[in-house]
Amino acid sequence: MADKILTPESQLKKSKAQQKSAEQVAAERAARKAANKEKRAAILERNAAYHKEYETAERAVIQAKREAKANGSYYVESQPKLVFVIRIKGINKIAPKPRKVLQLLRLNQINSGVFVKVTKATTELLRLVEPYVAYGYPSYSTIRQLVYKRGYGKINKQRIALSENSIVEANLGKYGIISVDDLIHEIITVGPHFKQANNFLWPFKLSNPSGGWGVPRKFKHFIQGGAFGNREEFINKLVKSMN
């Protein structure tokens, strides 16, 4: 009878290690899958809460306007906390000071746009560059469409499309911002981490307005029939034509 062939001890150890490694990989894969599922559920729950928050705020304004009208008074909206600023003029004939302000606002190219928190300081900056920019108060819809259609993040000085929530989480997760909709919420509410969220966003590259600027003289103030300056809620119409 032939001698029984024994598997060397080293071979047995290697086989057991490989089996353990395969089991560990499978366990880790299952754990990641469960964590991702939980994360997706949390994101959906947050998004639903955001949607409800936006709807509630909108209904409150409508109701307040109705009550004011019924009482024969006028509803005064709260001071806006956010503006969207678009550079509409190139580099020719710009004095050094406003040129520096445009750089500070990250508006280095014509048709580039950025969100700016309204403060006393930023209001002064906008006044200095008013002949070179159009700005106003963006709606939720405008902000959402901008981020989803033209949103890019600044990652290691590179311009990266916000194609996945994981890109946002990897860069802003430490601030509790783990999805594109979290990012939008932080911008629209001018939240506690607005600065970090806004700096993460690469300045938006917009197109020329579809159908042109629609004004006889572009470089006159908006209230005089031109294009530059504060156009308040009318900024939404302009962005829509450039997005």
Swiss-Prot record:
CDD domains xrefs: Ribosomal_L7_archeal_euk
Keyword Ribonucleoprotein: yes
Bias (Low complexity) ranges: 18-28
InterPro entries per UniProt: Ribo_uL30_ferredoxin-like_sf (IPR036919), Ribosomal_uL30 (IPR039699), Ribosomal_uL30_CS (IPR018038), Ribosomal_uL30_euk (IPR005998), Ribosomal_uL30_euk_arc (IPR035808), Ribosomal_uL30_ferredoxin-like (IPR016082), Ribosomal_uL30_N_euk (IPR012988)
Chain positions covered by the region annotation Disordered: 1-31
Cited Pfam families: Ribosomal_L30, Ribosomal_L30_N
Gene Ontology terms: cellular component: cytosolic large ribosomal subunit
Keywords, comma-separated and alphabetical: Ribonucleoprotein, Ribosomal protein
GO molecular function, one term: RNA binding
UniProt record, GO biological process: maturation of LSU-rRNA from tricistronic rRNA transcript (SSU-rRNA, 5.8S rRNA, LSU-rRNA)
Keyword Ligase set for record: no
Superkingdom assignment: Eukaryota
TM ranges: none
Entry similarity comment: Belongs to the universal ribosomal protein uL30 family.
Protein name: Large ribosomal subunit protein uL30
The organism of origin for this protein: Eremothecium gossypii (strain ATCC 10895 / CBS 109.51 / FGSC 9923 / NRRL Y-1056) (Yeast)
